[in-house]
Amino acid sequence: MTGSRGRQAAADGNPGNPGGPSRGAGRLRPMVPADLVDVIALEHELFPEDPWTPEMFAGEVVQPPDSRLYLIAEAEAGDGGVADSDIVSGRGAVSGLVMAGYAGLMFIPGGTQADVLTIAVRQSYWGQGIGSALLDALLSAARERGCAEVFLEVRADNPRAHGLYLRRGFAELGVRRGYYQPSGVDAIVMRKDLR
């Protein structure tokens, strides 16, 4: 992946919560290879027309930490209406936590830019601040790394995610026609100044 493959799924859309995650936001932790079964299942649920492949995720999650950051958002099972049958790997059944979402960030070589590659939140957890918490964690990591700006692409047919990015200070730069393949959906390119 080159960093231009970013897309976001209903990242939060909680207009009553512009400043940060709500009490339902759960906890964030680094993504590990053992998470990929759940991540790929959620990817196919949210992006059935153009999901990342298992190979893409497997290649991304093992990238050096100086080039990528992937996070998992966990929440208490049942907080978002997730049934036991929705827990693919069984991890949540043991820990009482379920994967509510995930996100990824690429640090551009040279150290002044980052690119949000993906943010996805399980639909039953929409509006609980999980997308906001994931985005805020990515932005914080970019600031800590000295990045001056963060870029992303968001599907033109995803007003929830687009609205979150606008509320978080991203500005539209343009449109990439037919960017998402094979669906052909346009991408809105956005940028946030971190200075």
What are these regions (language model features)?
Residues 38, 163-164:
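Well-formed, non-transmembrane alpha-helical positions, independent of function
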Residues 121, 155-156:
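Short amphipathic helical patch at the helix-1/turn junction of helix-turn-helix
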Residues 135, 157-161, 178-183:
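Short glycine/proline-centered loop/turn elements that form peptide/ligand docking sites
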Residues 151-153, 166, 171-188:
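Conserved catalytic-core motifs of GNAT/GCN5-like acyltransferases
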